[in-house]
């Protein structure tokens, strides 16, 4: 039984619907999608198991372990903390990068910059400098995907550099 919600028969579907409703009431865009990602992170459930078990009661021990975390994550999202910061990660150029409140969240439009460098500068001996690297997504993507030999990432923020490492 989950002490927080007082129920022992809560299903995955009900849990997701409640999370989506809570975020929707807070005016969060894409509330259902965000509730899914938060539930996935809090409980470690994947889509296959969700669809197979969505109408079955969640095992009490699993509910007890994840419910509080899920509620905390929903509250943060309702307060408009970005989903990526709550989850601590963002995909960029096919890789997953750590993010928190100390760095900007990598965006798809920045991927165009990386793609352009990869396309227009095939020479691997270039010296590349990523100023204000934040999460390090640009520098790391160029080094990994482009095979550039000399990529330097710098930031004035020690907190940002810890994220980039």
Regions found by a protein language model. Name each.
Residues 16, 35, 70, 80-83, ...:
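A general structural signal for well-ordered alpha-helical segments in protein cores
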Residues 2, 6-57, 70:
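A short N-terminal interaction module
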Residues 40-119:
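Conserved AdoMet
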Residues 108-165:
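Conserved SAM/SAH cofactor-binding pocket of Class I
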Residues 11, 62, 156:
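Conserved acidic
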